[in-house]
From Swiss-Prot:
GO BP: translational initiation
Expressing tissues: Ubiquitous.
Protein name per UniProt: Eukaryotic translation initiation factor 1A, Y-chromosomal
Positions with biased composition (Basic and acidic residues): 16-26
Segments for region (Disordered): 1-26, 114-144
């Protein structure tokens, strides 16, 4: 049987959680960039996004974001426009809900942009769920 000469398994490849909940500086768009909202995830590192200049573009998630940052539909992203292809773009950055709200407050995003409020359902969030008792408790399963 061969010796294990590797340097670790999946966990080593996954890497450390860098700046998980650390606040980062708000990044504004520059020339050649545009804000967009994700319409549809296409798979294979691609997505369809509606840029706020009114153009629907096919976007490619770059390698730095590919496995570290999870992008869902209706997320606000920053895309880099291509000079040679107007209908394609590259995802540069994903804004979280707080950053998207502050971008909207600064007037960078239009008013019709809907910011996705995803709830992670942490501990103690189950207080609002109400279940109704369906059926009678005195009914025995043998009587059916």
């Amino acid at each position: 049987m061969p010796k294990n000469k590797g340097k670790g398994g999946k966990n080593r490849r996954r890497g450390k959680n860098e700046n998980e909940s650390e606040k980062r500086e708000l990044v504004f768009k520059e020339d050649g960039q545009e804000y967009a909202q994700v319409i549809k995830m296409l798979g294979n590192g691609r997505l369809e996004a509606l840029c706020f200049d009114g153009v629907k573009r096919l976007c490619h998630i770059r390698g730095k974001l590919r496995k570290k940052v999870w992008i869902n539909t209706s997320d606000i992203i920053l895309v880099g426009l291509r000079d040679y292809q107007d209908n394609k773009a590259d995802v540069i950055l994903k804004y979280n809900a707080d950053e998207a709200r502050s971008l909207k407050a600064y007037g960078e995003l239009p008013e019709h942009a809907k910011i996705n409020e995803t709830d992670t359902f942490g501990p103690g969030d189950d207080d609002e769920i109400q279940f109704d008792d369906i059926g009678d408790d005195d009914e025995d399963i043998d009587d059916i």
